[in-house]
Amino acid sequence: LSGVGVVYKFLVGMTENELEHYLDLVAIGCIADIMDIHDKEVGYLVHKGLKNIRNEFFKEILKDFDLNDITPETISFNLANIINGTIRFGSMEECELLFKALIGEEEEFEYKPRKSKNNPNPQVQIETLQQHMVRIAKSVKQKQDKKKKECIKLCEKYIEENNCNDSKVLTIIDEERKLVDKRITG
């Protein structure tokens, strides 16, 4: 089990309160931590959690990505991906908003969409914290992806300049972090 699974099992043993309504958090945590869902206990928790997603932030992400088929793959490549991107690449304020969205705090934000051909004069809209955070998380993930591409180009340049193209196994040691941003590699 991952940390989220251990915490869940601990709480089940410590309280008589019903905790099944937290299984969506457990399932997504197990998937994000790349736990083996073929393990009976992990698989059970993931299956039960994905059948009943209650977290409003998770629901907003799934709605935004238009995901009707909720599987470990769709969670891993969409939901977990933008949450992880925000945690690694977001500002402290963005991470705090992410936490508030995850725990279900209620707050509203004004948002004015960009002008477009179809909507040359967009009106200010009110969005929930969860909707607001989905938009922010997607933006942060795009910035992270852009930075990742820059790092790959720097590594490719390094490989070329150091005549490493023919190496079957290649390790780049970047102690000074000139090539790869630590927010990308973890």
Feature names for model-found ranges:
Residues 1-4:
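Hydrophobic, small-residue-rich alpha-helical packing segments that form membrane-like cores
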Residues 15-186:
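Hydrophobic helix-and-loop "lid/oligomerization" segment in the mid-to-C-terminal part
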Residues 7-17:
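A charged, well-structured terminal subsegment
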